[in-house]
């Protein structure tokens, strides 16, 4: 990646992406060549959803609580279901599978003081004054399919997996801290979806990133540590993933997407687990999942290309009869 990222065109790129995707509210901040540029509603806080996981992992590490068990929980290798601390089905045992429940268990190390620990260990030392768990008065509210405004409330016990509000400016500052420190959190623990997962971060060929999606919000924090580049993008729409994808592509910051060879006929079928479902047929994937906070069903369809592309498609088939769709290992159910 060259340093000639079109930083001066950031506002234009974001406006164009909003027009193409019909997303009403978005904010983007880009730090490159020692300078941060902003676009959109960058002074207002959005819910950052699962980007919170990096803050949780960072706090656990800084508190000296990072043992083997919590390392497994924070890397999604503990074998838990998406929202319950129960074992995955036998067909999926031993596979990497995304779990909010694992993050809640890891945060239990703070014995009920998780929110205070994140504030004292991470937010205050970094000067992140616009980041926190309580809904700010000037918060942007999320919108669900049908342009329904999402309820901003969020259960306290769910906070470790996705509860923070933040601005793109604060996220860039947080990202820059990770560009220069905490390398132990960036060491890959498991391989999945054409990339590697560390502790609260995806690792792909020199890039670190994490996406977020909950309650009508879509978000991304993307870093290139060796070049001290940080990009934060926040949106208030379920269509926000498309906007963020366009912005990343237009800035020339998209990590390479890895694919693996496969036989289409061998993976066609229906896969399900705990409300997550995927139908693989005719060279495409149709996935559906419940929003973990609102319960709203979300559906998307994309070409069958095992691996992942940032903010778009993500699927692989780690063993016969199992698909990892949308980051969750799902057993096949139509045999």
Residue spans for each PLM region:
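Short amphipathic alpha-helical segments
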Residues: 7-15, 119, 268
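Active/ligand-binding-proximal structured segments within catalytic/core domains
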Residues: 52-56
């Amino acid at each position: 990646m060259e340093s000639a990222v079109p930083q001066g065109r950031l506002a234009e790129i974001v406006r164009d992406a909003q027009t193409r995707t019909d997303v009403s509210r978005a904010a983007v901040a880009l730090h490159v060549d020692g300078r941060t540029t902003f676009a959109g509603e960058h002074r207002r806080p959005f819910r950052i959803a699962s980007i919170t996981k990096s803050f949780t992992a960072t706090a656990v590490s800084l508190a000296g609580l990072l043992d083997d068990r919590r390392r497994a929980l924070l890397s999604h290798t503990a074998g838990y279901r998406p929202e319950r601390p129960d074992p995955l089905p036998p067909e999926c045992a031993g596979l990497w599978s995304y779990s909010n429940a694992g993050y809640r268990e890891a945060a239990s190390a703070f014995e009920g003081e998780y929110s205070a620990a994140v504030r004292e260990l991470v937010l205050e030392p970094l000067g992140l004054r616009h980041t926190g768990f309580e809904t700010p008065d000037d918060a942007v509210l999320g919108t669900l399919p049908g342009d329904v405004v999402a309820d901003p409330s969020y259960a306290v016990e769910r906070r470790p997996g996705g509860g923070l509000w933040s601005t793109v400016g604060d996220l860039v500052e947080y990202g820059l801290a990770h560009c220069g420190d905490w390398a132990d959190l960036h060491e890959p623990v498991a391989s999945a979806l054409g990339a590697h997962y560390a502790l609260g971060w995806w690792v792909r060929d020199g890039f670190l990133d994490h996406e977020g999606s909950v309650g009508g919000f879509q978000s991304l924090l993307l870093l290139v540590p060796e070049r001290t580049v940080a990009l934060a993008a926040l949106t208030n729409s379920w269509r926000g993933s498309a906007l963020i994808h366009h912005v990343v592509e237009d800035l020339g910051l998209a990590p390479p997407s890895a694919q693996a060879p496969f036989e289409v006929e061998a993976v066609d079928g229906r896969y399900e687990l705990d409300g997550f479902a995927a139908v693989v047929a005719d060279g495409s994937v149709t996935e559906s999942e419940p929003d973990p906070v609102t319960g709203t069903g979300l559906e998307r369809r994309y070409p069958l290309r095992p691996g992942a592309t940032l903010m778009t498609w993500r699927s692989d088939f780690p063993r016969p009869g199992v698909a990892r769709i949308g980051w969750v290992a799902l057993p096949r159910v139509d045999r």
